[in-house]
Each structure stands twice: as C-alpha cells, then as structure tokens.
C-alpha cells in the first residue's frame, strides 16, 4: 500500500490469520496481479509496471520494469496464455498492452495503446473516460475494459500474435452506475460488473456467435443495505477460489456483501451485508477455504479478519486487526511444488 511496497504473508487457513513473512520495496504499489501459470507477479508502480518471479518459498525476485508511456495505472491483468499484460489507466483513460516473455515473465514492448473517448453525465468525475478494470473473457478472445467515467464496458478482440486490440462491442451500463470492476464465472459463461455509484452487481450471460461476443443482462442485485444511497461506493469484487461465491465491499457504509453463485443460472443470492470494523474497504477476499474473510481498510490503515458462518449467514470478528498503511489489494496464492 505505502511506499514500502508489497508485503508477503504466510496464510493460516485453520485460524484464518496472516503472518508477515517479507516485504518487497517498491514505489507505490497500488495493484498487483499474478500470471495464470502462477510463476510471476506484476505490480503497478509510479514508473509503470514491474515483474517479480514468485520463488518456491513465496518470496519475490525482481525480474524487470517497463514504462506504460502514460499516467500511472490502476489495474493489471494478463491474458490466459500469459503472452500479454493489460494495464488500465484511470487518470488518462488509456489501455496499454505490453508483450510478456512466457519463460522469464519479463515485461517487453508496448504492442498497443487505446484511449477511450466520450463524455459522461455530470461535470465532475464522470465527465470523461476513467478506465478502472481490464479482464479477458475466459475463452481468451476478448478484452473487457470497464470505464466508470462514461458508464461503458468496451469489448475488444485481441490479436493473439500482434497484441493489438480491435473494438467489437460496447456494454452500455446504466447512467451514473460507474462500472468499476468485473469478473467472469469459473466456466466463463457469466460476467459480473459492480457499479461504484449504482452500488449494484449486474450479471450478464456471455457467448460467442458468428465470431462476435454477445452479453445479455439477466440480473441486477444491490451490494448494500441502502440501495443507491449517497455517500456509499461499491469498491472491490472478488470470486472465491472454488467459484461458488462472489464478494463485494462498500466504502461509506464500510461493509462487505457475500453472494452465492448459482452454478447453472449464474445468478446471485445475497447471504449477508455486514460491517467490517474499518474505514474504506478498498479490497476484501475470502480465504481459499471460504471459512474466513479479510478486509483491507484503506483509510483506517488496518486489515480486519472474520470467521464466516455459512449456516447463520453472518461473519464474526476473528482476533485482532493488523496494522498496514493504505492497503489497496490482496491476492491469495498457493505455492507450486
């Protein structure tokens, strides 16, 4: 979160706790992602992006860094073959595509740069493009780019050889909904988009027909107890390791909301929406066993921990909070043998 960079923790699944193991110094690491082969970690920095090899003991070994030729990014992801790295630009409304070395993980040259264009609805934050998330469809054909400034999710076909994007569709979200993050279901058939200002998750079906992507809205479900109330902003969106649950966090209300995913229909059923004993939950995630939950509270500089009672549909505070300065992002990673 702070200038000290990336903290590495050992995970105690039984107790639902984290123990600090190491710290990697890096300038303002605001978001990290792990390659789909599990070998490399990529981080946003003030300079651009940096790559680290994940060592057998979980430590990080610096590989290289690369410029994104623009203002600092806010979100990173890779395609499912780990051939390209995508960086979302909140401040300049730009998608940057960089080539990856699949053997070393090193970040290479920029293969494409696309600026979103358009106007939002109000003459404040939402009057120009702010790309907040970029994710590939699970069939590795299309890149979806959420833009909370103009209430669109732009869809691009990825040229797998050249790393070039070609726009083929637009998902038009509700006016002033501010699509912030998106996730695909484990089978790739459903898309979940959380609206920062709408405080709602929109569920879409996804399929390809005649070489084109199709997205159809099938559900909208609130993330908060007070639907569309001012002063509340949906922030994180994470799917559990087994794909059975989806978790959203809400700033302002300072709560987390857990939903169960219908494996056939893709629709969501809310289990609970409860406070996280901290301020501005920038990110939140279930432990890999789904029995515990952690919230990263950006404004109170804490991580808070909870036991998840699936029968009673509630969470219970689990021991003391951990102090951490301005935490932004958390990822659980199972070390490879």
Question: How would you name each of these model-derived features?
Answer:
Residues 26-36, 69-80, 117-138, 173-188, ...:
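Beta-rich, blade/repeat-based domains predominating
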Residues 1, 46, 90, 100, ...:
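Short loop/turn segments immediately following the C-termini of beta-strands
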Residues 9-15, 52-59, 97-108, 156-164, ...:
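Short loop/turn segments immediately following beta-strands, especially the blade-tip
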Residues 298-304, 316-337:
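Blade-level signature of beta-propeller repeat domains, shared across WD40, Kelch, NHL, RCC1
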Residues 61-133:
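Asp-box/WD-like beta-propeller blade repeats and closely related beta-sheet repeat scaffolds
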Residues 20-82:
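Blade-loop segments of beta-propeller domains
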Residues 19-25, 61-67, 118-124, 166-172, ...:
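A short beta-strand motif characteristic of beta-propeller blades
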């Amino acid at each position: 979160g702070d200038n000290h960079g990336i903290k590495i923790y050992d995970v105690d699944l039984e107790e639902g706790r984290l123990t600090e193991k190491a710290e990697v110094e890096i300038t303002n690491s605001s978001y990290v992602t792990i390659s789909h082969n599990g070998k490399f970690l990529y981080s946003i920095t003030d300079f651009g992006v940096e790559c680290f090899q994940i060592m057998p003991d979980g430590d990080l070994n610096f590989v290289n860094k690369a410029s994104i030729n623009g203002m600092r990014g806010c979100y990173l992801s890779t395609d499912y073959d780990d051939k390209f790295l995508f960086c979302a630009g909140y401040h300049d409304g730009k998608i940057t595509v960089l080539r990856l070395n699949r053997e070393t993980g090193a970040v290479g040259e920029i293969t494409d740069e696309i600026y979103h264009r358009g106007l939002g609805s109000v003459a404040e934050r939402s009057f120009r493009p702010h790309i907040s998330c970029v994710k590939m469809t699970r069939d590795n054909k299309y890149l979806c780019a959420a833009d909370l400034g103009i209430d669109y999710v732009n869809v691009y076909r990825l040229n797998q050889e050249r790393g070039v994007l070609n726009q083929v569709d637009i998902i038009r979200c509700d006016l002033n909904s501010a699509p912030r993050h998106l996730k695909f279901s484990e089978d790739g058939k459903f898309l979940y988009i959380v609206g920062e200002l709408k405080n709602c998750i929109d569920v879409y079906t996804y399929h390809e027909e005649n070489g084109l992507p199709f997205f159809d809205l099938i559900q909208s479900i609130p993330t908060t107890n007070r639907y569309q109330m001012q002063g509340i902003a949906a922030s994180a969106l994470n799917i559990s390791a087994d794909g059975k649950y989806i978790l959203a966090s809400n700033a302002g209300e300072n709560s987390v909301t857990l939903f169960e995913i219908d494996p056939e229909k893709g629709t969501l059923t809310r289990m609970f929406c409860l406070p996280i004993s901290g301020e501005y939950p920038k990110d939140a995630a279930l432990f890999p066993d789904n029995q515990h939950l952690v919230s990263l509270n950006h404004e109170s500089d804490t991580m808070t921990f909870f036991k998840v009672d699936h029968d009673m549909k509630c969470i219970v505070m689990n021991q003391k909070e951990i102090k951490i300065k301005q935490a932004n992002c958390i990822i659980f990673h199972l070390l490879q043998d």
